[in-house]
């Protein structure tokens, strides 16, 4: 935090001066403000990440590695922990992933199945959507899964969390834009390795906003293009390469969001338990449900999901209204609501200011209980989602077995359903 304070020293704009401005504001003036803000953002990022500039993954203690990789719940994992417990050395992300993959075979993707695609979505901003996508990617990778993270938000917040400056380091070929424009039919070449072992990234930048114009224009072409299936079709190779695909979506019902929802096997909807967020979430589901009224969406039997999870985020136990709103959410969404919750914590904003998450902390400088509370919450969410992934793979296998045994009764399954 001190590095951030130093970064803005001498660059503050007087609030009094700003308040005294009179007269019209030209586009040139807006452009100069944008340039100033962009320069300051670059300076802050450079200071926070100096001297390496690039983010580095943390190292964990043996106890942390066991807890975050799910090894503590497996007999073989417990043996691994016992074998390493006497060693007072750091465990890398790669080592934790390798141990999880070897010692948790029941949770790994069957070779005959494709990746589970998860869209993290909410039409309202500020609900913890990007942080949820990032921590899911990190948490699932620590469980031994190979993860592809896709940033579909032109703001590029997920890209920034991976330590990449969207405005200057991202090219079109690193985004989903060429796919959505029809310049290619495979998103896999856009994926790039990241600082976090086991997680690759398809980045985003403001240029991705052009997709909001390109997608509907493709629908007017006479080639039978379905605008809501562009991303789904482009993920075929990625589904054979990765175990799970996590998509961060824009906070709006945009063409990009629709493509993410139509490509997904499962959806995670983060929401704080406040009255305003509850009302906004109701609109989300209503608009989402309106898809069923579109005859074109229903071709092939309709879209189906393996799981949908509503995740309570930024849960403030000191908020007297919170229990009531939590009750509303449980009453409205029932089995969709995850038992795990993300508490409001001083850790999350501190890490966000440093362009990171709770998983990026190897050693926490503050109260140990504070860190344990937030990291254990994210780990519990990861466990819930992983169980849903495993169940989806098993259900799909049973469905395929039934279709093989009774081919005449199987019908024609929608290509968008869980793979």
Protein language model regions, located:
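The alpha-helix within a helix-turn-helix
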Residues: 66
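Core residues of bacterial helix-turn-helix
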Residues: 69-70
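P-loop NTP-binding core
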Residues: 1-63, 74-79, 83-419
């Amino acid at each position: 935090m001190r590095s951030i304070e130093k970064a803005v020293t001498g660059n503050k704009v007087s609030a009094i001066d700003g308040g005294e401005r009179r007269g019209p504001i030209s586009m040139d003036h807006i452009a100069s403000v944008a340039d100033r803000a962009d320069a300051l953002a670059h300076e802050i990022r450079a200071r926070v990440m100096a001297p390496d500039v690039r983010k580095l993954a943390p190292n964990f203690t043996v106890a942390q590695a066991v807890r975050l990789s799910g090894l503590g719940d497996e007999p073989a994992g417990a043996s691994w922990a016992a074998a390493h417990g006497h060693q007072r050395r750091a465990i890398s992300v790669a080592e934790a992933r390798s141990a999880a993959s070897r010692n948790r075979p029941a949770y790994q993707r069957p070779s005959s199945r494709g990746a589970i695609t998860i869209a993290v979505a909410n039409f309202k901003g500020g609900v913890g959507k990007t942080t949820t996508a990032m921590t899911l990617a990190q948490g699932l990778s620590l469980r031994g899964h190979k993860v592809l993270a896709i940033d579909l938000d032109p703001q590029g917040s997920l890209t920034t969390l991976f330590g990449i400056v969207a405005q200057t380091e991202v090219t079109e070929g690193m985004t989903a834009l060429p796919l959505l424009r029809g310049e290619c039919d495979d998103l896999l070449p856009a994926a790039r390795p990241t600082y976090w072992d086991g997680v690759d990234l398809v980045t985003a930048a403001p240029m991705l906003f052009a997709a909001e114009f390109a997608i509907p224009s493709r629908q007017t072409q006479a080639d039978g293009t379905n605008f809501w299936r562009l991303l789904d079709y482009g993920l075929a190779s990625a589904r054979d390469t990765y175990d799970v695909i996590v998509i961060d979506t824009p906070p709006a019902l945009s063409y990009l969001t629709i493509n993410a929802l139509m490509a997904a096997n499962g959806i995670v909807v983060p929401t704080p338990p406040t009255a305003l967020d509850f009302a906004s979430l109701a609109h989300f589901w209503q608009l989402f449900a309106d898809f069923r009224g579109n005859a074109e969406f229903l071709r092939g039997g309709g879209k189906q999901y393996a799981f949908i999870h509503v995740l309570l985020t930024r849960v403030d136990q000191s908020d007297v209204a919170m229990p009531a709103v939590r009750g509303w959410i449980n009453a409205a969404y029932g089995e969709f609501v995850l038992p795990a919750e993300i508490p409001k914590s001083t850790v999350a904003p501190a890490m966000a200011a440093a362009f990171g998450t709770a998983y990026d902390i190897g050693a926490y400088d503050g109260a140990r209980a504070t860190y344990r509370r937030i990291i254990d919450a994210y780990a519990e969410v990861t466990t819930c989602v992983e169980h849903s992934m495993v169940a989806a793979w098993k259900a799909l296998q049973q469905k395929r077995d039934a279709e093989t045994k009774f081919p005449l009764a199987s019908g024609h399954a929608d290509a968008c359903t869980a793979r």
